[in-house]
């Protein structure tokens, strides 16, 4: 019984907290999404360039040893 009351109280508090959350409007949501997508794209390009550079440097070092 006590355990069920604690669960009920927990979910009641969760419900109360959702009313306090700042929910973005459609314009803010789209702007934030575009920023995240752009940041991921830029970071992916940086990782691609670094990976390609390291690969080429390693290939160069391995061919020098032959």
UniProtKB/Swiss-Prot annotation:
GO BP terms, alphabetized: intracellular protein transmembrane transport; protein secretion; protein targeting; protein transport by the Sec complex
Subunit structure: Component of the Sec protein translocase complex. Heterotrimer consisting of SecY, SecE and SecG subunits. The heterotrimers can form oligomers, although 1 heterotrimer is thought to be able to translocate proteins. Interacts with the ribosome. Interacts with SecDF, and other proteins may be involved. Interacts with SecA.
Localization of this protein: Cell inner membrane
Sequence similarity: Belongs to the SecE/SEC61-gamma family.
Pfam families: SecE
Chief subcellular location: membrane
Protein transport listed as a keyword: yes
UniProt GO MF annotations: protein transmembrane transporter activity
UniProt KW keywords: Cell inner membrane, Cell membrane, Membrane, Protein transport, Translocation, Transmembrane, Transmembrane helix, Transport
Transmembrane spans: 29-49
Described function: Essential subunit of the Sec protein translocation channel SecYEG. Clamps together the 2 halves of SecY. May contact the channel plug during translocation.
InterPro entries noted in UniProt: SecE_bac (IPR005807), SecE_sf (IPR038379), Translocase_SecE/Sec61-g (IPR001901)
Membrane topology: Single-pass membrane protein
Protein name per UniProt: Protein translocase subunit SecE
Any Gene Ontology CC annotation: plasma membrane
Species: Rickettsia typhi (strain ATCC VR-144 / Wilmington)
């Amino acid at each position: 019984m006590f355990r069920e009351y604690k669960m009920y109280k927990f979910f009641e508090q969760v419900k109360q907290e959702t009313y306090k959350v700042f929910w973005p409007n459609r314009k803010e949501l789209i702007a934030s999404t575009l920023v995240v997508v752009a940041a991921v794209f830029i970071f992916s390009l940086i990782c691609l360039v670094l990976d390609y550079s390291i690969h080429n440097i390693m290939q160069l070092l391995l061919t020098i040893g032959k």
